[in-house]
A protein has these predicted regions:
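Small-residue packing motifs within transmembrane alpha-helices
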Residues: 10-13, 195
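Bacterial N-terminal signal peptides that target proteins for export
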Residues: 1-10
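C-terminal segment of classical bacterial N-terminal signal peptides
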Residues: 15-24
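Active-site-adjacent loops and short helices of periplasmic peptidoglycan-processing enzymes
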Residues: 25-197, 202-206
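Domain-terminus/edge residues, biased toward the C-terminal soluble/receptor-binding domains
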Residues: 168, 172, 183-399
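Hydrophobic alpha-helical segments, especially transmembrane helices
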Residues: 3-4, 80, 260
Length: 399
């Protein structure tokens, strides 16, 4: 009997022990589940960038921002100013893409991202620009700076001069490449707002999109492959530029341009903890704004505009002006009908009228804010009436 009782007690204690252990496991699982949302919230907060901005490219209007004037190191986004200087000089005829750029000893020893330029090696300015914009080559940036201004110091002065002229008031450049400063040197500084200003200016030059949207390209006769650091080019079909930037102290940065139809956004993200967090954040913002906004066609090139304009001295007495260009206004989808159109035309124009001559303008407004303009021009040449006709008209006769 005692043996049976002892056996029963062993079985009972085993079952109770199992239940206690099982309950302990269950409690741990419940506890983990209970705290998971808080952990996720902390993790999500840690993935937020230090600063960002979303701008509508046509109007330059800032749609959303956080710390957009906070000065931060742009890292390789510094190279966007190099691109602007080169493209501006080419537009003015001061340089050509076929110009040959020679590599100095200093340029050949640049670290970080590079195309391993050798001292004395020469490439066309266009090849150097591809290395700069696609592969973020620091050696190419340095070589271009020396080619344009003679010395690194003089080129940096030019960079700051251009920044000031563009109204980039949060910016100070100290290098053409954006690498971390050596001991005793100052770091490059800018803001999301200033990078957006620069990006908007760069969009005036189609070449910058051609280069920055290229995922891979050959260099040095195909012996070296340029790989684009901007992974957003593969994430969203709308993304076509512009430049990433990173070093440990500043975090992950990117200046993005994206276009869908007539709608284009510029987004600048600075100080993300990881490149994945930066890209996820950028994509989320772009998707939301593409969903919320639309481009409204408010003027079509060549369409008649307003009342006829009286020609005081023309062979013909009146002419009807036309819109000089197509105009699309970005607007929230539920505000499409709120855009107002104001036509400003003179009562009369003296002398001959040339084809394409400006007669007036159309101003587009939303909430009393100007959101777009287009010239009203003459669709044809109207010569001055002869002397006899003009004299007769002064008598009041309609000739």
């Amino acid at each position: 009997m005692k043996k049976h009782l002892a056996a029963y007690l062993v079985v009972l204690l085993t079952i109770v022990g199992f239940l206690v252990v099982a309950d302990g496991v269950s409690a741990k699982v419940v506890k983990a589940r209970r705290w998971r949302p808080a952990a996720e919230a902390v993790d999500k907060a840690s993935q937020q960038p230090k600063a960002y901005l979303v701008m509508e490219a046509t109007t330059g209007k800032v749609l959303e921002e956080q710390n957009m004037h906070e000065k931060r190191a742009p890292a390789s986004m510094t190279k966007l100013m190099v691109a602007y200087i080169v493209l501006d000089r080419i537009a003015k005829g001061e340089n050509h893409l076929t110009d040959m750029v020679r590599t100095s000893a200093v340029a050949s020893h640049m670290g970080g991202s590079r195309v391993y330029l050798k001292e004395g090696e020469e490439f066309s300015l266009e090849d150097m620009m591809k290395a700069l914009m696609i592969a973020s080559a620091n050696d190419a940036a340095y070589a271009i700076g020396e080619f344009i201004s003679g010395t690194r110091e003089d080129f940096v002065d030019l960079m700051n001069e251009k920044a000031k002229a563009l109204g980039m008031n949060d910016t100070e450049f100290h290098s053409p490449h954006g690498l971390p400063p050596d001991k005793g040197q100052k770091e490059d500084l800018t803001s999301c707002f200033d990078m957006a200003i620069l990006a908007r200016e760069l969009l005036k030059y189609p070449k910058v999109i051609e280069w920055s949207s290229t995922k891979t390209a050959d260099f040095r006769n195909g012996t070296f492959i340029l790989n684009n650091h901007n992974k957003l080019l593969s994430r969203m079909p709308e993304v076509d530029g512009l430049k990433t930037g990173y070093y440990r102290e500043t975090g992950y940065n990117v200046t993005v341009t994206a276009k869908r139809g007539d709608l284009r956004f510029i987004e600048v993200v600075m100080g993300s903890a990881t490149w994945k967090a930066r890209d996820e954040f950028a994509v989320e913002k772009l998707k939301r704004f593409f969903a919320e906004f639309t481009a409204v066609n408010v003027a079509k090139k060549g369409e008649p505009v307003g009342e006829e304009v009286y020609l005081s001295d023309g062979k013909y007495r009146k002419i009807k002006g036309v819109a000089a260009a197509d105009v699309s206004i970005p607007v929230l989808r539920d505000r499409k009908k709120d855009i107002k159109r104001v036509v400003n035309l003179p009562r009369a124009v003296k002398g001959e009228v040339k084809e394409g001559q400006k007669l007036g303008e159309i101003v587009f407004q939303l909430d009393n804010e100007v959101v777009g303009k287009v010239d009203v021009v003459s669709p044809q040449y109207v010569p001055k009436a002869n002397f006899f006709t003009r004299m007769v008209r002064k008598t009041g006769l309609n000739l």
